[in-house]
Curated annotation (Swiss-Prot):
Its main location: membrane. It is a multi-pass membrane protein. This is Glycerol-3-phosphate acyltransferase. It catalyses: an acyl phosphate + sn-glycerol 3-phosphate = a 1-acyl-sn-glycero-3-phosphate + phosphate.
């Protein structure tokens, strides 16, 4: 029963779209600004770096807190961790409180990975930073870091439930970036 409550908690916490909440408090409708996304990147474009960093941190915590509880309560090799991590990211992408229209899940996924392995999260962030500084595309950096996280977890020998979680979350993140991928391939993606 505790496991079920944790998964539900993870989804509901993930469903709090902090970008949208903060933007509304500032009188901005993110759906009508920039990319229309509710994540940290669009918040940065619409409200500035201070609010973008705040949203990134809050979205990160949405993944980190439930995943850390799962790791501490059930162990890293427990499928409870897998479903908790997935629920956090799915909540962010498809939030019940905001008409199932959320963000792309990158910061929330990073929080999940950090709860599993701070070193893998750090390496993935460094990959993101390197690609971003080189190409100035947030989407390309996010996709590359997502793939890198799975590879780092695989090489480090993490259990199958963690690898499964990383594959599913990675596939969801790439799917949520499908329009960005199309724009990257056609040279129409916006640089940051």
């Amino acid at each position: 029963m505790k496991a079920l409550f944790l998964v539900i908690f993870a989804y509901l916490l993930g469903s709090i779209t902090f970008g949208e909440v903060i933007a509304k408090l500032k009188g901005v409708d993110l759906r009508n600004v920039g990319s229309g996304n509710v994540g940290a990147t669009n918040v940065t474009r619409a409200l500035g770096k201070k609010y973008g960093v705040l949203v990134f941190f809050l979205d990160f915590l949405k993944g980190f807190i439930p995943a850390l509880i799962a790791v501490k309560s059930f162990g890293i090799d427990s499928w409870v961790l897998t479903f908790t991590g997935l629920a956090s990211v799915l909540g962010h992408m498809y939030p019940v409180f905001f008409g199932f229209k959320g963000g792309k899940g990158v910061a929330t996924a990073l929080g999940v990975v950090f709860a599993v392995s701070p070193s893998v999260a750090l390496f993935s962030f460094l990959v993101w930073l390197g690609i971003f500084l080189w190409k100035r595309y947030v989407s390309l950096a996010s996709i590359t870091a997502t793939i890198s996280a799975f590879l780092f977890l695989f090489v480090a020998g993490y259990p199958v439930n963690v690898l499964f979680m990383a594959i599913v979350i990675g596939a969801l993140i790439i799917y949520r970036h499908r329009e960005n991928i199309n724009r990257l391939l056609t040279g129409r993606e916006h640089r940051f």
